[in-house]
Every structure is written in structure tokens, then in C-alpha cells.
Amino acid sequence: MSYVFHRHCHATLPIIDKGEGVYLFDKHGKQYLDACGGAAVSNLGHSHQAVKKAMLEQLERVPFAHTGFFTSDSSERLAELICQHMPEQFNHVYLVSGGSEAVESALKMARQYFVESGKPEKKQFIARQQSYHGNTLGALAVGGNEWRREPFKPILHPSHHIAPCYAYRYQQSHESELGYSLRAANELEAKILELGADNVMAFVAEPIVGATAGAVPATQGYFKRIREICDQYDVLLILDEVMCGVGRSGSFLAFEQEEAEPDLVCMAKGLGAGYQPIGAVVANDRVYQAIADGSGFFQHGHTFMAHPVACAAAVATIQTIFQDDLLTAVNRQSALLRNELTSALAHLPYIGDIRGKGLFFGIELVADKESKAPLSKATLADKRIKQRAMENGLMCYPMGGTIDGVNGHHILLAPPFIIQSHHIDELVGKLSLTLKEVAETWK
């Protein structure tokens, strides 16, 4: 009997033993190619020496000091390092312990910004359907995945949702890419006007929608128009880069590839590359100064925020990304992975779309290519693909509910930045085999 309250109470999981590079090994010695980084976490693979060394050095100095009493060299260095790779108006980093905490902090920061600015009536959040922003109550409230929200709706703060920017599903045949971008973005303006601009404080979005929809990038011009709308109606733009940030998309942050900058940006997952739990909210000068020049106190906090060892791990992670030129590697291997996925899978009758940026890919499964009808829920495609992939020595991240939280299936891929060409061959080969084996059960 296990005394652990596992997320699936009746699951029988292999016991992890060790990690080396892009591979994980269980207690029986079985080797798994990590093609998803757990959940887009393990940017540097497993057992990276520079990160382990930085953590050990910090442990030998001091493992923990509460931020109500001390700051630390590692947290100061991390905040500085993050800001060095941000646009010039981002100069303050709030350090927490994970993605949900980062989003919760950003939501409260947005609220306090307007309270400090003399606009306490601004209290409504707008986000997007099929978004995912975390599992804590505030983050779940702005999230747009109905399956995750449903049991907890009675205790969620009311939030409002518009359609996602999801070209494969919603761009019409007669629309140009820009035309679709503007139509999708203008839903935000319509929702703001419906609620009253004086009541809306922030719009929350993932630049690349991650787990719930499968690496869905925005179309060209979408976020440029979103930024214009936010500016027009005095609404903060919060971008959630918990999954797509810190190099995953091929740039340090995904919004760098858009024509828009946020007011607050959240990051986590790859920030510590899985070596320690850590997250961050980066505030632009406008938001920070409103609080600093007002009460001077952000009314929020957690015991383990800015944890010295976690910060040391994150410093080493970011330094490694830039010193080893891993963003170049991400973009180079992205092209190879896209080509191999397309060659091996695109012709299959159940592959609807292969999409993504950097080393962040989604493969959407369908019952019919022309109509884009989803696979039946009865196929249990996500569960069966995950199980069979593990049997084949591959870790990928299949999910159900791609379209609306109930219907649709996709596979998310987010391999480590250190992945080599022969690993990509192995990844695509094992994934192709897995899909062909599982597809036999759909007939």
C-alpha cells in the first residue's frame, strides 16, 4: 500500500530512480525518453551538473531565510538576471514557488494596482476559453477549462471568458490570418464594453496555449490588437508564460515574438528546470511604481517565496541557457522536430494539426481530417496513448478536452533544450509506433 495521496488514487506508477540527460530511468532500469519535460519543466534535462553545483553551494551557505527578515544573494541575482533579458520597463520581479502561485500573485497585484491608483471599482478579470492558469482557486477562476472548473464553480470568483485564438478550429476559410486575428481580438473589446470599462481590471492569456489545447500559438497581429484594446480601456495585460516561457518557444519569453508587451508576466516550470520549485511575476514600472509610491506594501506573500536554493537553481538555469546558446539550439531542433513529425504523422487519417513554436508542439487528433470531427471520448485516446508510449519508453503529454474541455484529444511535446538529432529520431519513431498501435483500438 502507498501512503501517498496520488492524483489518481488507483494508478500504478513506476518508481523513478535516476535521470541522465534526456532520459529517466525507473527502479527496474527501464529507460524513458523525456519528450515532454514532465509538463514543459525539464528544459536542461536531468542531472545537469551546473545546476546541481549551484544548489549545493547555496545549501552549504544557507538553505532558507524568511523574506520578512532577509533578502539573499541568489534572489537578488535571479531578479537582476531576469530583468536583463526583459524589455527596459521591466525592473522588478516577485519570486514565488510555482506557476499557480505566480498567477495568483499577478491577479492580486493587478487588483492592488487599481486600488492604489484610486480605481477600486475595477475588479473584473477577462480570460479565454480553453486557457489554463493553474489549479488554485484564483487561477482556476480565470482559467477557461470547464472540466477543471466544474466541481469548484460554486466557490470560484466570477470571471469572464472570450473565445481563444485557435486558428485550426475557428479561422474561417475566407479569412486572412490578420482578419481572423482582429476578429478574435475584438471579442475582448466587446466583452469590456458589455461589462463596462470602469469595472474591468485585467485580461489574462497564454501567448501559446499549453496543456489544455496543445501548444496553440496566436496568429499574427492578435496580441498587437489585444494590447491596443487594453491601453484604450485602461486594462492590464497579464501574460501567463508559465509553460511557454524561459526559452521554450525559441525566445526567452514567448511575447518577444508578438507585437505587444504585457504589464505583468508570469513564469515558472522551466525557470528552475525542475531542479527546484520556483515561479515569478515580472511587473512593469507602471504597476510597480503605483504600489511603491502608494502604500509601499504588496499585501501578499508565502513562506517559501524567493527561496535561496530555488533561486540559485534558477540563476544557474538561465545562465546555462544563454552561455550554452540553447535558444539557438531550440530553434534549430524545432525545425528538425517539425519536419520529422510532419513527415511521419501528417498523412495519417487521425492527425488533424501539428503546431507550435520552439520545442513546444501540439498534435491534434481527429476522427476525420476534412470535417475536423474529434475522436470519440470512448476511445480514451489520451489515456491509452500515454500508457502505450510509456511501455515503448517514451514520455509524452496526451490530453483530452482539447476543443471545449470535454471533446477532442491532443499530444503535447516539450523535450529538453539539450535534445540532439538522434534523440528526435527516437522520439518521432516511438511516437509514430505508439499512435499506430493505439489507433488500432479506435476501429
Put a short name on every predicted segment.
Residues 1-443:
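Conserved N-terminal phosphate-binding loop of PLP-dependent enzymes in the Aspartate aminotransferase
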